[in-house]
């Protein structure tokens, strides 16, 4: 994949000088608002077919960060998506004895950017990109179908079910649209 559009989007945000790189939250609504702001701002600098749907970003952020941003990874590492550390990236260890190294981000927005870049660049998410492109061409957004492409995101065999359940909950609460 050509990473130039993603790099250009990141540089554009960095140079804009008007973006709030960090946000404080004390409740679920503030957490959701911060994630939305970052996702919308970053996506606005990407070509349409490189954007990760806001609904999907919210579903994964809320699932991975304990539904309200209060997971240890979110609070101590600004990591809202359970993104693993690679090579020499700063990390914290998972407390579940798995030895998983979870990446630490300096700023909260960096987690949203890394999540978007991960889905756009990693070979693990080629199915996601293909489905997103198909939906883009057909002018549709089906979060359920996109979720089904993310089985490699976590080792949990019930991960897809849990994401779909989170999407259902967020739809019921009026936080995300139907996605179809």
Predicted regions, residues:
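Catalytic cores of secreted/periplasmic lytic hydrolases that degrade extracellular macromolecules
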Residues: 2-59, 63-180
């Amino acid at each position: 994949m050509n990473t130039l559009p993603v790099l250009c989007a990141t540089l554009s945000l960095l140079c804009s000088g008007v973006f709030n790189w960090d946000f404080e939250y004390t409740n679920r609504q503030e957490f959701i608002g911060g994630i939305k702001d970052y996702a919308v701002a970053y996506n606005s600098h990407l070509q349409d077919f490189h954007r990760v749907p806001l609904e999907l970003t919210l579903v994964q952020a809320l699932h991975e960060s304990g539904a309200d941003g209060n997971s240890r990874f979110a609070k101590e590492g600004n990591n809202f998506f359970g993104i693993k550390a690679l090579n020499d990236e700063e990390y914290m260890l998972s407390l579940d004895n798995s030895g998983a190294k979870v990446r630490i981000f300096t700023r909260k927005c960096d987690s949203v950017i890394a999540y978007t870049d991960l889905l756009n660049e990693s070979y693990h998410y080629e199915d996601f990109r293909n489905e997103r492109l198909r939906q883009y061409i057909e002018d549709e957004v089906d979060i359920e179908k996109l979720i089904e492409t993310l089985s490699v995101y976590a080792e949990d065999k019930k991960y897809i079910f849990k994401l779909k359940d989170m999407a259902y909950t967020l739809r019921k609460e009026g936080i995300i649209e139907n996605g179809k």
